[in-house]
Swiss-Prot record:
Protein name (database record): Ribosome-recycling factor
UniProt record similarity statement: Belongs to the RRF family.
Superkingdom in the source lineage: Bacteria
GO MF terms, alphabetically ordered: ribosomal large subunit binding
Phylogenetic placement of the source organism: Bacteria, Bacillati, Actinomycetota, Actinomycetes, Mycobacteriales
SUPFAM superfamilies assigned: Ribosome recycling factor, RRF (SSF55194)
InterPro entries reported in the protein's UniProt record: Ribosome_recyc_fac (IPR002661), Ribosome_recyc_fac_dom (IPR023584), RRF_sf (IPR036191)
Intracellular or extracellular location(s): Cytoplasm
Keyword flag Cell division: no
Gene Ontology CC terms: cytoplasm
Keywords, in A-Z order: Cytoplasm, Protein biosynthesis
Residue pairs linked by disulfide bridges in the UniProt entry: none
Coiled-coil ranges per UniProt: none
The encoding gene: frr
Length: 185
């Protein structure tokens, strides 16, 4: 029972870190990155489909992304989705592929993005701590119901605290890495 609760907690915390990693990867740095388009979705024959499934995305230069749709009919729809997104880039369409020049970020914009990264990191830490709180409540219930001994439950609480601390540190490292990427000129 206790092991199950701890295992579930670790699994959920890992998922929270994974979501944080994905959220942070969506924050645009000054460099071109194919991942910046992973959340863009277009209407493809009636169903919402990510651009990454409709085109190959390559980065031939540090500040240039080339998108080549598998289906040439979708060229305009992909271009429109990129233009209407919050990425702050302007795609150019040459009839067969889309070139996206990634402009250099201003110092002010870098600072905004660092704040955004810290906010996403804080959200992830809050979700990890909420997972910890729920498992602690479960452990207290187990102790109260007499399903496990006092020593077992307190050992499990210490393990849970250690696990929580490890995942919070992982999130801090992700945010610090992203901050370094953003502030690098």
């Amino acid at each position: 029972m206790i092991d199950e609760a701890l295992f579930d907690a670790e699994e959920k915390m890992e998922k929270a870190v994974s979501v944080a990693r994905e959220d942070l990867s969506m924050i645009r740095t000054g460099r071109a990155n194919p991942g910046m388009f992973s959340r863009l979705v277009i209407d493809y024959y009636g169903s919402a489909t990510p651009i990454t499934q409709l085109a190959s995305i390559n980065v031939p230069e540090a500040r240039l992304v080339v998108i080549k749709p598998y289906d040439a009919i979708q060229l305009h729809a992909i271009e429109t989705a990129i233009r209407n997104s919050d990425l702050g880039v302007n795609p150019s369409n040459d009839g067969t592929l889309i070139r996206v020049a990634v402009p250099q970020l201003t110092e002010e914009r870098r600072r905004e993005l660092v704040k955004q990264a810290k906010c996403k990191g804080e959200d992830a830490k809050v979700s990890v701590r909420n997972i910890r709180r729920k498992v602690m409540e479960e452990l207290h219930r187990i102790r109260k119901d007499g399903e496990a001994g006092e020593d077992e439950v307190s050992r499990a609480e210490k393990d849970l605290d250690k696990t929580t601390h490890q995942y919070v540190i992982q999130i801090d490292e992700l945010v610090k890495h992203k901050e370094g990427e953003l502030l690098e000129v």
